[in-house]
Amino acid sequence: PELLPAGKELSEGEVVRAVSEATHNGAILVTDVGQNQMMSARYFKYSKERSIVTSGGLGTMGFGLPAAIGATFGRPDRTVCVFMGDGGLQMNLQELGTIMEQKAPVKMILLNNNFLGNVRQWQAMFFNRRYSFTPMMNPDYMKIASAYDIPARRVMTREELAKAIDEMIATDGPFLLEACVEEEGNVMPMTPPGGSVNQMLLEC
């Protein structure tokens, strides 16, 4: 597969890479769980030690936002970026109240594909795209951010991305960047359940 897919729609990987480059690979990366977690591990670069906070394989959706708040207090000298999917963000959405109260300067990047992406990928690959309980009904995240007095920007196209990231980084305090990415993007390669490395799948 392509290292960095570049179809008509934004991909999760290119958003992650763009944020990494804009922060000169020096930010602390916090991940939630799902495709966003794997894309972050794949496309975010580091120039310093102790630069990633993740729950690994525990599957704790909703981990990212509160962990990022903690990281801003633990390392106030560094930029903290958290990547989340729309499913994970809605599991701990109330933490925006903590960010507002504490003025925690978390840079939140929402990779919104309107799906529980990781589960959808499995349903696509192993269940003939019979999507069950994976499509997401999302609220207007710009209105939610406004309600919490958090600056926010929604990006729909590749041309808008760099400017929005620069705005996020330049903002003194928290910021929510919603990137509307391709709905059926996949994280490849992957090993099928019970399979070995030599059975690795390269495409969906």
Give the role of each language-model region:
Residues 1-66:
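Active-site diphosphate/adenylate-binding microenvironment
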Residues 39-204:
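Thiamine diphosphate
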